[in-house]
Amino acid sequence: RYKSDSLSSQVAYSSVYPASWDWGNINNTNFLTKNLNQHIPQYCGSCWAHGAVSALSDRIKIARNAKGLDINLAIQFILNCGVESAGSCNGGDHYAAYEFISDYGSIPFDTCLAYEACSKDSSEKACQSRDYSCKPDNICRTCSTFSYLGGKCKSIDNYPNATIANYGRVSGYKNMQHEIYTNGPIACGINANAILNYKGGILDVPDESTDV
């Protein structure tokens, strides 16, 4: 079980930051967890969950000073159990994802539950043959072998998980800059159209719609 650190800053606020900062390469050490694709194995509008959970996984790695095996958290758990409050493959909210994890009490490691890019309201054909409700074996399970070989799965009651000490909102690029530099990646919603031509620096497109 891993409990995340407080959202509050661990160092004094500074107005001076390096010209660039990449948690993926700090003195040749990668403090980030693996890259993910929300649309594998099929389309799923779960960018909000990927952003929230990836930032949490990264912060755990930063808190552990990149020691030991990476702890990746189960995004599928939020799609199974947070569909009513946080979102689904049809969209959701990253802040609501943190709220759900906090209210539920924990989030399992992804070794409990592989990402399937499905939720119970998915229209993709591949998602129609399985139950994605929030039942014990859709939180953490172990299987004897592959289903096409006749394998059976059962739930695990005591499973590895992470918790959230607290969470909150950060607004304004200076506060975001400070939070990222001090504590690690953050999750945020943006209009993705502007990213198509993004080359670097602060993304500032005042004429673009702010609707997300």
Feature locations, PLM:
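Catalytic-core signature of thiol
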Residues: R1-V212
